[in-house]
Amino acid sequence: MSCVPGRERIKDGFALVARAFIVGRMSIPLGIGRHETLVMMARNLRKMGGDPPMRRVVITGLGMVTPLGCGAEVTWSRLLDGVSGASKVTAFETEDLAARIACSIPLGDGSDGTFNADQWLEPKEQRKVDPFITYAIAAADMALEDAGWHPQSDDDQIATGVLIGSGIGGLEGIVEAGYTLRDRGPRRVSPFFIPGRLINLASGQVSIRHKLRGPNHSVVTACSTGAHAIGDASRIIGFGDADVMVAGGTESPICRIALAGFAACKALSTNFNDEPQRASRPYDVDRDGFVMGEGSGIVVLEELEHAKARGAKIYAEVVGYGMSGDAFHITAPSEDGEGAFRCMTSALKRAGIAPSDIDYINAHGTSTMADTIELGAVERLLGDAAGKVSMSSTKSATGHLLGAAGAIEAIFSTLAIRDNVAPPTLNLDNPERETAIDLVPKVARKRNIDVALSNSFGFGGTNASLVLRRYAD
């Protein structure tokens, strides 16, 4: 498939700013290279009141491995049915841990939505990588298959990139390698220890597997990782550095050290160890922390003209991406919600969409004290339009997938647009306070959804918001 149409638009954009330079509207020093010229032209264009021309980006493929099941449609169906992925942890000893529950991927033979790693990697290959990489490989395979994109030519492979992030990466593998070094000596440390745990190797493995030779990148921004990955990948396409990007997040954090560490931060639910499916309860007065989850969410992003030229199905368009920093605390969000507010505002500005145009918000909503801060920021954003918006936290069903959370929630927002339904916030028995916003308690709500906003906020005050819109020419 030729990528000429999209690249021609970038050339047209270059010609546009070049003409502005020629007629004297821009001042560019002589003796600098093409790249520096483009950068300076872009800066001058902004000063003139415009932005560099951006190509439109659409979502054409979805892939998921989650605590609700393997596959986007299975996961989505169970989410709408109010299924919880939480259960008691049985894979390792938890008696001495404060938090003894998690949202684990259902394992099995691959039927009925269970995950069977053997369907994606040979056992020998599985031993060379951490599960977070295995999950990314599986989700990426599903997304590419869903998109019907299997580049074979040099041009198509070079025009397709990968951007998959993770918040923690191979945490358990690092601990196990430490034990091996201590107990058995350095010669027994596997040569695959490093490449099997590095976060960017999720992107690397997918790139190698599918011969994708475009931008090969990764991102690590705690719980905002998945959203940042999709947002950054959309900009890579928008700026013309690729025509297709495989993007998202992946995580496999459920192990003793992670449960102990997050509990030490007072971030995990510990009051519902005997009732795990009631533990994740965003906005509820009895919430006491998040439930750790695992899995991967991957999307295929595509330049619009490229997707149309090959007849791809289009789920939604990525029209806005905002980022901000709280500069407040290593784990807590700024108490006034200013960072979240600026992040959402930035995403809407980029999208050219007013707050009153939003139909659905997939909240960060982790079932912690920060829920109230996010709610206040959203109310400030929406103003008088709050009463027309539905906002839910799907973490009530999936738990918190950390670096993969923003990616699976972007997929949920995409499917909410496709099916005109807002997924529920489970366990919302007693809202902490009143709000005009519909928090979609317990049961999914059918309603018109043309525009969705997906929020992700992470430790260190790193924030990301994505705006998705129903595709229209």
Regions inferred by a protein language model and the residue ranges of each:
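Conserved beta-ketoacyl condensing-enzyme motif
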Residues: 59, 80-221, 250-261, 355-372
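Acyl-CoA/ACP chain-elongation machinery
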Residues: 90, 241-288, 321-335, 363-372, ...
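Condensing-enzyme catalytic core mediating Claisen C-C bond formation in acyl metabolism
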Residues: 56-60, 87-88, 275-353, 360, ...
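Glycine-/small-residue-rich "gating" segment that lines the acyl/pantetheine channel
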Residues: 183-190, 228-231, 235, 239, ...
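Phosphate/pyrophosphate-binding loops at sites that engage ATP/ADP/AMP, CoA/4′-phosphopantetheine
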Residues: 143-156, 307-311, 344-360, 381-385
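ACP-dependent fatty acid/polyketide chain-elongation machinery
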Residues: 42-125, 305-317, 411-425, 469-473
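Active-site-proximal alpha-helical scaffold in enzymes
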Residues: 136-149, 202, 207-210, 215-251, ...
